[in-house]
């Protein structure tokens, strides 16, 4: 498949053109024209690029790519080494950020809901769905369930939350700023990847459980699902590689 055809295929699947983002979605660094072997991962770190080189991949597809708004345009140090690895090995780099959070099937939010057994009921605002667990569970039990499913112990604050949790809102990655919207909507718990200092005060003062389950851990699902979709629907050879990250 041509590198530009792959870009169009995924853009169409994720409806990228309809979503404004903080970084370019699609082909970010051009490599060889023909793509067959692909490595995917959450972030285009040096470790992932090194794996792509080792596996002789033609392309790398990630959720967190390069060239973010507000980022320094200077190419030096870490950025130079990463780009040099791609260019020297003629590897294409593709990134899809918010489109891969929001997609109702392959998106990070949809995949997290499926993993945790949450039935999606609607959306509080863009990128913040809400839903229900099959039955009410104590806050500590939900924390244990999140740990079991994600392989990472979440930071849990349930000081003033209800005895049991059933109505849940969530936003994968760095979605802690949405806690107030979730509280106003009226859920028992809010799940995201990261926590800020003020997040805990918001949870305590508004009476809901809060879980910070890891930016990386909550965003493995989307890129993994996209990898599976490509393997099932094309003749491409796609391998998801999880580079461990406790954050």
Swiss-Prot record:
One of its GO terms (molecular function) is metal ion binding. GO terms for biological process: DNA repair. Transmembrane segments: none annotated. Keywords: DNA damage, DNA repair, Metal-binding. Gene3D superfamilies: NIF3 (NGG1p interacting factor 3)-like (3.40.1390.30). Provides significant protection from radiation damage and may be involved in the degradation of radiation-damaged nucleotides. Belongs to the GTP cyclohydrolase I type 2/NIF3 family. This is GTP cyclohydrolase 1 type 2 homolog.
